Amino acid sequence: MLSIAICDDEEYFRTTEKKLISKYMAGKNCECMIDMYESGKELLALRSAISQYNIIFLDVNMEEIDGIETAKEIRKITKDVF
């Protein structure tokens, strides 16, 4: 089972991405678990638990800490997430 995180500050996009990913994965007969986060700060608060995810989708334009900076911080924690 794939573990996926979606990090976007806009609820509409988080929900839409989750639906699209779920539909795609179901079409490939692949089980997945999808968690959603409202900010890079919320996601980064997981610290080492971030490594539970196989894939993380990040919004580039977010308040406080953007997707690029969030990705840099994730890489400091783990290099095993795409």
PLM features: residue spans?
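Receiver (REC) domain active-site loop signature in two-component systems and cognate sites
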Residues: V60-M62
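Acidic, metal-coordinating helix/loop segments flanking the phosphotransfer/catalytic sites
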Residues: K18, M36-I55
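Two-component/phosphorelay signaling modules centered on CheY-like receiver
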Residues: E11-D35
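Conserved acidic carboxylate
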Residues: D8
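Non-catalytic signal-transmission and effector/linker regions of two-component phosphorelay proteins
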Residues: M1-S3
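Conserved phosphotransfer cores of two-component systems
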Residues: S48-S51, E73-D80
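Acidic catalytic/metal-coordinating carboxylates
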Residues: S39, D66-E69
